[in-house]
Every structure is written in structure tokens, then in C-alpha cells.
Amino acid sequence: MTRSGQLRGLVAIDLDGTLLRDDKSVADADARAIVDAVERGLAVTLATGRLITGTLPTARKLGLVTPLICADGGLLIDAATGAALERRAISIAHAATAIEALVAHGLLPYVFSADALHCDSAGAVHRSIVDTWSREIVVHPSLMHAEGWRHPEGIALTVGLGNRVAVGRASEHLRQAHAGTFDTVHFNLGQSPVWAVRSLPHGCDKGDMLMRLAARLGLPGTRVAAIGDWFNDLGMFAAAGRSFAMGQAPDAVRKVATDHLAATSATGGGVAEAIGKLLADWT
């Protein structure tokens, strides 16, 4: 997993808001730091909410070889081929239940398979918003009745888009009525008036898959580090022995991190800052 062949530790890096700056570029300092980390014995992975197709381009540009964590911990994939190595999935029946709930609350429903995003024609209006997760968007006449996303292995997650009030109500319903099936959260999408409610398989988060990856590599939690900026990074912050919060991270996220970074998603450089500390401390 490293060019030196001797593994000193594992570093998991969030994409949007951490490695990727606000303009979706990678700072030169961060790219160089990742190369240096690999050459000096660290396994580097990406841990993101994006799907396979939204993750692989960045991983390939950086030359990463360690398996990648996608769909907020729902998938562990081969960095070269994109093949799923491990997955946590929502069954087709449960996905249909989620879609029904989203539609009942007046939201536009989306289903995320491992490598594509599925919606109907109304949902396609928000293509510029949802293509952060994946640029592979499949539009169906009716999402509920479409067969294209109904694969035996299930789906990665469901999302509903709408206004703040409707999203909040849908989120509350899913958390109250289906707590044993889904882990549901809702949030604003950037500075837009659009809000999202997202449901993952119950118990699924980045931290769980990160520790599964560490076990594959034969590394203890004390030799695992995570770099992130948002609430979906809290699971891996809790699991990792060392955690780094970006400068723009909310106070609730920074509070649980072991280290606070000065760099932000506007400046870039947070990954380089964190890797520098790890290389100094992990002798």
C-alpha cells in the first residue's frame, strides 16, 4: 500500500471541504504532502460521501493505491478498478419505503447506487447540486417504478431535496418510524435554499469502514488518522487515534478532534499541515 513497502500508519482524508478546496481543486502543497506520505510509509485513503464515480478521478490523479471509502462508509472500493471490496447497503424494499416517505413529504427523491445517482425528471432539475456525489446521473420517468436501480446488492443511500420545513419533517419521520433501518440526517446544501435529507444503512458511517480498512492493513487504531471538516466525519474522528479538523469546521466538529488545523477549504493546505504533524510524530 506504500511505495516503501513498510507501513507506518493509515491516513483517511475527506474530499469536499478538506482535500478539495471550495473551487474543487487540490492545493499543490496537499498533493505533494500525499506523495511524500506514501513514500515515507503511510497508507493514504479518501473517505467521502461521494459515490465511486465521484471519488476515483481524484484518487487516480494522486496515484492512490489504498482502498477508498465511499458513500459515507457504505462502500470500500479498489482504488484502481473501483470494484466494491466491502459494502453496507439498504435493501430494495427499504429503499422503496424511504422513497414513499420522501414523496409523501413533498420532496424530490433520489436513490444512490454504488456508481450512479437515480432520479426522475423533476429531480433532474437539481443536477448541478447533486452531481457533487456523482456525475453519473440516470433519469427515469418514475423513480418509484424504475427497475434500473433495483439491484440485488441493494443501494448505498437515499436522498430527498426540498425546502427546509419539508425536509425537517421528512427527516423527523424517518428517524422516528425507521430508526432501526436508516441513519438519517438533514442539512442545507451550501448557500442555496435547497435542503437535503439523507438516509444511510443503520450503523453505517465512515469510522466503521475506516477501522475495517485498518484491520485489512494490520494497523491498530492508534496508527489511524482522519482529516475532515463536517458532521459526517465525526464517526471517523471517534474511531481514529488522531483526528484533524479543518479551520472552517463547525465548532461541534472541532471540539471532538484531537488537532485543529489553521488551513481552510478556501486556502487549502490542511492536508499538508496534518501530514506534516503525523510524519513528525509517527516515528
Residue ranges and their predicted role:
Residues 1-13, 39, 61:
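Non-catalytic pre-domain segments flanking phosphatase-related domains
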Residues 2-10, 26-27, 199-283:
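Mg2+-dependent phosphoryl-transfer enzymes with acidic/Ser/Thr/Gly-rich catalytic loops
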Residues 7-23, 98, 237:
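Asp-based phosphoryl-transfer active-site loop
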Residues 25-132:
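Active-site phosphate-binding/coordination module
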Residues 30, 55-59, 170, 174, ...:
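Hydrophobic packing residues within well-ordered alpha-helices of enzyme cores
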Residues 31-39, 103, 175, 211-215, ...:
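Surface-exposed amphipathic alpha-helices with a cationic face
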Residues 62-64, 71-72, 178-180, 239-240, ...:
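Short, structured coil segments at secondary-structure junctions
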Residues 112-227, 231-233:
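Conserved acidic, metal-coordinating active-site core of Asp-based
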